[in-house]
């Protein structure tokens, strides 16, 4: 019998993307409730408890409520895509390539917290350097990023695509998170192995899907002898054997005139780059991904597959 999967919040942006990725699969059975019944708590609870894996695509408070609905049922495993549990030590963090053991931890877990889109890029760049001893304690990390507007859900999609919307956004690019308290900072800090919270400056561009995350570094303030080449080598070693996360060769990066934010639109992979001038004292680390792919729905399906294979 095929394992039963219930997407709680299947009619939202992330939920719809997960359904699209699972369309046509015969190895799982998708449970579903009509959109008109999506707020029917009794029906949701029945579906949640009838699933082998429940994928929660809900706001934080609603996710916490859903977890309570299945807390006594050890037969139900949960993947949550909100920020509610990402730094909870009782939950496996769903970035399978984060370190060599993480995929196994996800596979064995009952509760998996799907990473945020921005943290996937930031942690993907930062954690290997912390693990390798290149990035010292106390280093003042800055993370700058731009996302496609689908990351803001249905409300922002309407604001960006409908010029008649009462709160229409006409700017081709805008900065937000201005008080520097974005909800993704805690998971960047914890899973990036940082002892000091980064300064995170997110922004949104007038494109639907895609993301660029940048982490600029001063080599003089890193471990003695660190070069652009040694940073690149550390990333290559960390992701050796991985298919979903790849490190672009330095020669290929050097030849690029630009990085296109929508290059990986519709894909569930992530590319990492190291930019700079050999012998200079600065580098810029860049992660490229689809905010709805490896940054959300693609990661959720990847985590589901790891859990089903265990």
Swiss-Prot record:
Leading EC class: oxidoreductase
Superkingdom of origin: Bacteria
Subcellular location(s) per record: Cytoplasm
Pathway(s) where this gene product acts: Amino-acid biosynthesis; L-arginine biosynthesis; N(2)-acetyl-L-ornithine from L-glutamate: step 3/4
Presence of the UniProt keyword Amino-acid biosynthesis in the record: yes
Matches recorded under PROSITE patterns: ARGC (PS01224)
GO CC terms, sorted: cytoplasm
Keyword Amino-acid biosynthesis among record annotations: yes
Main location: cytoplasm
Catalytic activity: N-acetyl-L-glutamate 5-semialdehyde + phosphate + NADP(+) = N-acetyl-L-glutamyl 5-phosphate + NADPH + H(+)
GO biological process: L-arginine biosynthetic process
SUPFAM superfamilies: Glyceraldehyde-3-phosphate dehydrogenase-like, C-terminal domain, NAD(P)-binding Rossmann-fold domains
Keywords: Amino-acid biosynthesis, Arginine biosynthesis, Cytoplasm, NADP, Oxidoreductase
Active site: 117
GO MF annotations in UniProt: N-acetyl-gamma-glutamyl-phosphate reductase activity; NAD binding
EC number(s) on file: 1.2.1.38
Pfam families for the chain: Semialdhyde_dh, Semialdhyde_dhC_1
Record-linked PANTHER family: N-ACETYL-GAMMA-GLUTAMYL-PHOSPHATE REDUCTASE, CHLOROPLASTIC-RELATED, N-ACETYL-GAMMA-GLUTAMYL-PHOSPHATE REDUCTASE, CHLOROPLASTIC-RELATED-RELATED
Protein family (similarity comment): Belongs to the NAGSA dehydrogenase family. Type 2 subfamily.
Physiological role: Catalyzes the NADPH-dependent reduction of N-acetyl-5-glutamyl phosphate to yield N-acetyl-L-glutamate 5-semialdehyde.
Protein name: N-acetyl-gamma-glutamyl-phosphate reductase
């Amino acid at each position: 019998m095929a394992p039963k999967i219930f997407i709680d919040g299947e009619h939202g942006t992330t939920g719809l993307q997960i359904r699209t990725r699972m369309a046509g699969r015969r190895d799982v059975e998708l449970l579903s409730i009509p959109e008109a019944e999506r707020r029917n708590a009794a029906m949701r609870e029945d579906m949640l408890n009838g699933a082998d894996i429940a994928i929660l695509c809900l706001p934080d408070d609603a996710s916490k409520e859903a977890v309570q609905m299945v807390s006594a049922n050890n037969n139900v495993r949960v993947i949550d895509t909100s920020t509610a549990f990402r730094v909870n030590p009782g939950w496996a963090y769903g970035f399978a390539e984060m370190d060599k053991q993480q995929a196994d931890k996800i596979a064995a877990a009952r509760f998996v917290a799907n990473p945020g889109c921005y943290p996937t890029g930031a942690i993907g760049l930062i954690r290997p350097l912390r693990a390798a001893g290149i990035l010292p304690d106390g280093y003042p990390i800055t993370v700058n990023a731009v996302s496609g507007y689908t990351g803001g859900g249905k409300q922002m999609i309407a604001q960006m695509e409908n010029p008649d919307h009462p709160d229409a956004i006409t700017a081709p690019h805008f900065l937000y998170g201005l008080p520097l308290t974005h909800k993704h900072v805690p998971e960047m800090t914890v899973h990036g192995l940082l002892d000091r919270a980064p300064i995170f400056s997110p922004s949104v561009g007038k494109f639907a899907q895609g993301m660029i995350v940048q982490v600029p570094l001063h080599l003089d303030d890193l471990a003695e002898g660190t070069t652009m080449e040694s940073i690149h080598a550390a990333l290559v070693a960390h992701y050796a054997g991985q298919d979903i996360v790849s490190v672009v060769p330095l020669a290929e990066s050097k030849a690029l005139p630009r990085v296109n934010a929508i290059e990986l639109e519709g894909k569930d992979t992530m590319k990492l780059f190291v930019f700079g001038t050999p012998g200079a004292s600065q580098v810029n680390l860049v992660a490229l991904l689809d905010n709805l792919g490896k940054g959300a729905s693609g990661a959720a399906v990847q985590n589901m597959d790891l859990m089903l294979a265990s």
